[in-house]
Regions:
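Conserved acidic donor-binding segment of nucleotide-sugar-dependent glycosyltransferases
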Residues: 349-350, 354-360, 369-374
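Nucleotide-activated donor-binding/catalytic signature segment of Leloir-type glycosyltransferases, i.e.
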Residues: 259-300
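Acceptor-binding helix/loop patch of EC 2.4 sugar-transfer enzymes
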Residues: 60-69, 122-154, 257-268
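Aromatic "clamp/platform" in nucleotide-sugar-dependent glycosyltransferases that forms part
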Residues: 316-317
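Conserved donor-binding/catalytic core segment of Leloir-type glycosyltransferases
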Residues: 204-224, 230-235, 247-248
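Short hydrophobic beta-strand element within catalytic cores of glycosyltransferases
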Residues: 334-337, 347
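Donor nucleotide-sugar binding/catalytic pocket of nucleotide-sugar-dependent glycosyltransferases
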Residues: 145-201, 206-208, 212
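N-terminal subdomain of nucleotide-sugar transferases
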Residues: 1-48, 234-237, 412-422
Length: 422
């Protein structure tokens, strides 16, 4: 290995989980780091990023594969074979070996790299399967979807077994794996570069004197707790708490959500109607019509809107980690969160927020108490900013480098001798 390790991050998605880390390691001289992704991303982002590499999957990875029940395996094979060729070509072009590959488990599937390259391999796995992740029982998968989910589970168990190290974003995510595999899995949440903005000041938004209660997620899905938020708003309005209160739900209301099966349920429940989950829930909770839905926003506008919120509700149902929660905390948002899943790993009760059980009255009581206690909200906000600082990329990068060195050491100890590059 060279003094400065050659590290290649891999994902068909860019920007993605480790693109900021890749750039940070390179800019600070910690690694000769590169990001390998699809040609379209290289063409789009290449002028602003000098360390992008392209690879071409061995066939189409979007759309149906040859057999539904093995589609994820087939798609991963196409990605893996394309990666192998691209990595070998990169090593030949550079005249040196890659020391470490850090691959997204599905969008950089490393299953076809084992024993084919000299580099240590780290697999980044969000969660082992949708079965382990969980879904809202009101919107269940079809039997065929449940069976096809075994593809994902098999790929991830294989990676956890064969990779020099696997990384997951939370201890909760690691707990979803069989105990026999957990010792091969490290926990490390991503690094961020989020700059706090004083709440309610300098947001660039029109002044609104009302107390603002917010919900924020990439998509407005049941997994993120969107239904719970609307149900709580409905009850608050019914009980007279809606006066002088502004409610806002930030996120994409499109029917196709990331971690659930709501879209197909909506199509079957409302055939021929262009309805999304928001429309459905507003029929169930009509008093929640007071909620503002700004939709998916450009990042700068999203940041300003977050800064205008006095109290965030984060009633997560299912999930293993979330950028959205860190976006709130790092800016000093006051958070009421679920006391299960990964949330307690970021929110400490009565320190940088509050953790609540799955009981509506507990949430309503906490909302009223915090609304009446600006000093407590300010204390939570200050602690939340410190939480965000702990996950700033400058603080997280050394932890990642420790894990990377561990994986490379394991590779040196266990790999069979291989011929040097000519």
């Amino acid at each position: 290995m060279q003094d400065k390790p050659v590290i290649v991050f891999i994902s068909t998605v860019y920007p993605s989980q480790h693109s900021l880390l890749c750039s940070h390691l390179r800019a600070n001289g910690l690694a000769d780091s590169w990001f390998m992704t699809m040609p379209g991303h290289v063409k789009l982002h290449g002028p602003q990023c000098d360390h992008l590499l392209e690879f071409q999957p061995d066939g189409a990875i979007s759309g149906p594969q040859s057999y539904y029940y093995s589609s994820k395996v087939e798609r991963s094979a196409r990605i893996g074979r394309g990666l192998l060729k691209a990595l070998q070509a990169f090593e030949k072009r550079q005249g040196r070996r890659v020391d470490l590959v850090v691959a997204h488990s599905l969008w950089g599937a490393p299953n076809w790299l084992y024993d084919e390259i000299d580099a240590a391999i780290i697999s980044y796995i969000e969660f082992p399967s949708f079965l382990a992740h969980g879904w809202d029982p009101a919107f269940p998968p079809d039997p065929s979807q449940r069976q096809a989910d075994r593809n994902m589970e098999m790929l991830h168990f294989h990676q956890a077994l064969r990779s020099d190290l696997s990384i997951v974003p939370s201890a909760y995510a690691r707990s979803l794996f069989p105990p026999v595999l957990q010792e091969r899995i490290a926990v490390q949440f991503e690094g961020f570069d989020i700059r706090p903005q004083p709440l309610k000041t300098g947001t660039g938004l029109p002044e609104d004197p009302r107390f603002t209660i917010g919900f924020s997620a990439r998509d407005l899905s049941t997994a993120k707790g969107f239904e719970t938020f609307l149900r709580l708003v409905d009850r608050m309005v019914e009980q007279g708490d809606g006066a002088q209160t502004r409610f806002v739900a930030i996120g994409d209301a499109a029917p196709n959500v990331s971690y659930g099966y709501e879209k197909q349920w909506l199509e079957r429940r409302y055939p021929g109607q262009d309805l999304n989950l928001r429309d459905h829930f507003l029929r169930l909770y009509p008093r929640a019509q007071v909620v503002e839905f700004p939709g998916r926003l450009p990042y700068a506008e999203f940041s300003r809107l977050l800064a205008s919120v006095d109290l965030f509700l984060y009633p997560l149902r299912h999930g293993v980690a979330n950028w959205g929660l860190m976006e709130i905390l790092a800016r000093g948002g006051c958070v009421l969160g679920s006391n299960w899943g990964f949330v307690p790993e970021l929110v400490q009760h009565d320190i940088n927020g509050m953790l609540l059980p799955d009981h509506d009255q507990a949430w309503l009581d906490a909302i009223r108490a915090l609304r009446a206690d600006p000093g407590r909200r300010a204390r939570y906000a200050e602690a939340a900013i410190r939480t965000g600082q702990r996950f700033h990329i400058s603080q997280v990068a050394p932890r990642y480098m420790d894990l990377f060195r561990l994986a490379m050491a394991r590779r040196r100890c266990t790999a069979p001798a291989r011929l040097a590059l000519s």
